[in-house]
Each structure stands twice: as C-alpha cells, then as structure tokens.
Regions:
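C-terminal catalytic domain of Rieske-type non-heme iron oxygenases
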Residues: 1-207
Length: 207
C-alpha cells in the first residue's frame, strides 16, 4: 500500500493510512490487508468510506470493515474490498504473456428502483473509476521496468508479504519440478506467519 501517496494522492490517500496497515496470511495463498484511515488528530480518524451510490447496509459486516479499508485476496485471482455497503471483487484472468483481463464487480444489497451502486466504474461501465485508471496505468509502467535489461529484482519488505505469499503458493500448486529454477520464488514465509500464527503477537506480549 505504500504506492498510495504517489499513485492515489487525491483518491485513496485521504481514506487510508498506508503506514499502519496490517497483513494477515491465510493457508493456501489467501490473504487480507487492513488499513485504518489517516489520523486527523490524536483522538480522531478521517472517514474510510467513499460514496459509490450504495445506501442499503450489509448488517452482518463487523467493526473493522466499518472503520478501516479492507482488501481480501482469494487465491488465485480474486482481490476485493469489503465495506458495510458493498463487496467489490476484482478478478484477474491472464490471457497471454504480459497480458491480463480485469473483471470488475459490485455486489450490494437490493437498492430498489434507483440506479445501482458502482464501486469500480463510472456510468455503469462506461470507463474505469479514477482509482483503477491510476492503478492500471501504473501497472503498465511496472511491467516495462521489469522487462528492462537493467532490472535485477527488488528488495521486499512486510508491505509485499501478501504478494510473496501468493507466489509461494502458486509455485507449490504448479509443482517445483515443473518450474525453472530462475523463475521460482524462495519458500521463505513459513507456517509461523500463517493465520492463526503471527510472531508479532508474541513480541508485543513480551514487550
């Protein structure tokens, strides 16, 4: 999420504090990110929900989704926001080398006779919303950088944990004997990081 201030300065940054995000890794490549809204002052946070036209609440949604930005990754190709108003999956379908089809969904309670909510597009699919336009344009630049002869890899940190966890599980599913060594990722995230385990909990207890 550290790309938010640079790529989404006016769209996402007002809703999300990228410095306070928490990753949860689940078995089989699934994951979740939770990030609170930015602090207005020592006692108050900003709002974390943007208006996408949804008015009927999902009554069973808990406190975290009502107060923070949540993003769930369901292996292998589902990423979705979850708020008290909508479930908004993005589905990624690889359809060639360096190509991918992006499918956008907005799932919400019955909105009656009015116009339905739309989390990812404008005018019922006329174009992508500004957030997705920013992401997709940024993704093209990342792909070009990775294909450059000068690209030798990047150091990874906690921020990329969910992505790396996904890649580890993709290799496990494909089979290590079917992947050229130079294309496989090192299996460095162990079970001690997979929910319900988390080494940081013990560290906090010890402190």
């Amino acid at each position: 999420v550290y790309h938010v201030p640079n790529i989404h300065p006016t769209t996402v940054a007002p809703l999300l504090d990228h410095r306070r995000n928490v990753n949860t890794l689940y078995a089989n490549g699934h994951g979740r990110m939770v990030a609170p809204p930015p602090r207005i002052d020592e006692k108050q946070d900003a709002e974390s929900t943007r208006d996408v036209g949804a008015r009927a609440e999902i009554a069973t949604v808990g406190e975290i989704a009502r107060t923070c930005i949540q993003s769930y990754g369901i292996f292998p190709n589902w990423v979705s926001q979850l708020t008290e108003f909508v479930l908004a999956p993005l589905l990624f379908w690889p359809n060639g080398i360096a190509k991918c089809r992006l499918e956008c969904w907005t799932i919400a309670p019955d909105w009656g006779d009015g116009e339905g909510p739309d989390y990812w597009t404008v005018n019922n699919g006329e174009r992508l919303c500004d957030i997705l336009l920013e992401d997709t344009e940024f993704g093209t630049q990342i792909q070009r950088s990775m294909e450059s002869p000068g690209f030798k890899g990047v150091p990874l940190s906690y921020q990329e944990a969910r992505i790396y966890h996904w890649n580890q599980n993709a290799d496990q599913m494909i089979g290590f004997d079917r992947i050229p060594a130079e294309l496989a990722v090192r299996q460095v995230i162990g079970e001690d990081w997979v929910h319900t385990n988390d080494p940081r909990v013990n560290e906090m207890t010890e402190q």
